[in-house]
Design a protein with these regions (language model features):
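Structural alpha-beta junctions
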Residues: 11-12, 43-48, 109-121
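DNA replication initiation on ssDNA origins
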Residues: 1-82, 89-100
Length: 134
């Protein structure tokens, strides 16, 4: 996990892991990628679904224009190292025009896009409901 996160995340800033369990969502700030990995393993061991932010942030939290404390906002975004895509798959997503019916179709479209734009081969993660591409 550390190699993956190091390859897609910037080398500076505040990082976030998000945990979800029984409908409750919580952000956990981390100062290093090593700390992110440790926190992700800890939360996973306690039955949480664990996600990560694809950018780093300037601060652990900030006060927005409405006086509310916020964490992972565009205003607080610090750095990004990579581009990322979340490609949804499934018959319902395809019927709504919001994704591809099957993974094979999504991979073919992704390959055509990469060739057309001239991007390097990405890291592809099968997310369960589609593809995460970095």
């Amino acid at each position: 996990m550390k190699n993956f996160l190091t390859s897609i995340l910037p080398g500076q800033g505040v990082y976030f892991i998000t945990s979800i369990k029984a409908g409750a969502c919580r952000n956990h700030s981390c100062r290093t990628i090593h700390e992110m990995v440790r926190k992700a393993h800890e939360l996973d061991a306690h039955g949480y679904d664990v996600f990560f932010a694809c950018a780093s942030f300037k601060e652990e939290s900030h006060i927005d224009a409405d006086g509310k404390r916020r964490q992972r906002t565009g205003e607080n975004a610090g750095c990004a190292k990579s581009f990322w895509l979340d490609i949804d798959c499934g018959p319902d997503k395809a019927a709504e025009g919001k994704g591809y019916a099957i993974i094979k179709e999504a991979l073919a479209a992704l390959q055509a896009f990469i060739i057309a734009v001239g991007l390097p081969m990405p890291i592809i993660v099968f997310s369960g409901g589609g593809l995460h591409v970095y």
